[in-house]
Amino acid sequence: MKLNLYVLTPKRIIWDCEVKEIILSTNSGQIGVLPNHAPINTAVDMGPLRIRLLNDQWLTAVLWSGFARIVNNEIIILGNDAELGSDIDPEEAQQALEIAEANLSKAEGTKELVEAKLALRRARIRVEAVNWIPPSN
């Protein structure tokens, strides 16, 4: 059996194809979705989206929050923004992480601290996405 996966943002369609499985970051943790999954509507948290293609190859995307609906082997993810893992430059992601860590240590005041923590979280997620090693089949 297959799942129809659609990942949409206000700017573009990120994904539109059949897949075997996904692992999705939600506000209550990561969930795995296989064919015939129970219907669910859930908030999507900032984090990785793991996609297992029909040929068993795994791909990674990064979702920057949104909403997901899973019903009748169809997954529709409406994201505020998203990036494909293949579009993320590993060196640039690592550099952004180092800058975010430095900015957090220099942050003063509540607003700066919140912004620095958010930037650090985003940078960590991007680094995690490009460094992820898929499970062996």
Swiss-Prot record:
Classification via Pfam families: ATP-synt_DE (PF00401), ATP-synt_DE_N (PF02823)
InterPro entries xrefs: ATP_synth_F1_dsu/esu (IPR001469), ATP_synth_F1_dsu/esu_N (IPR020546), ATP_synth_F1_esu_C (IPR020547), ATPsynth_dsu/esu_N (IPR036771)
Entry annotated with the keyword Ion transport: yes
Organism domain of life: Eukaryota
GO molecular function, a single term: ATP binding
UniProt keyword annotation of Ion transport present: yes
One GO-annotated biological process of the protein: proton motive force-driven ATP synthesis
Major subcellular site: plastid
Localization, UniProt: Plastid, Chloroplast thylakoid membrane
Membrane-topology descriptor: Peripheral membrane protein
Entry's Gene Ontology cellular component terms: chloroplast thylakoid membrane; proton-transporting ATP synthase complex
This protein's UniProt keywords: ATP synthesis, CF(1), Chloroplast, Hydrogen ion transport, Ion transport, Membrane, Plastid, Thylakoid, Transport
Function of the protein: Produces ATP from ADP in the presence of a proton gradient across the membrane.
Similarity section: Belongs to the ATPase epsilon chain family.
Complex and partners: F-type ATPases have 2 components, CF(1) - the catalytic core - and CF(0) - the membrane proton channel. CF(1) has five subunits: alpha(3), beta(3), gamma(1), delta(1), epsilon(1). CF(0) has three main subunits: a, b and c.
Protein name: ATP synthase epsilon chain, chloroplastic
Gene that specifies this protein: atpE
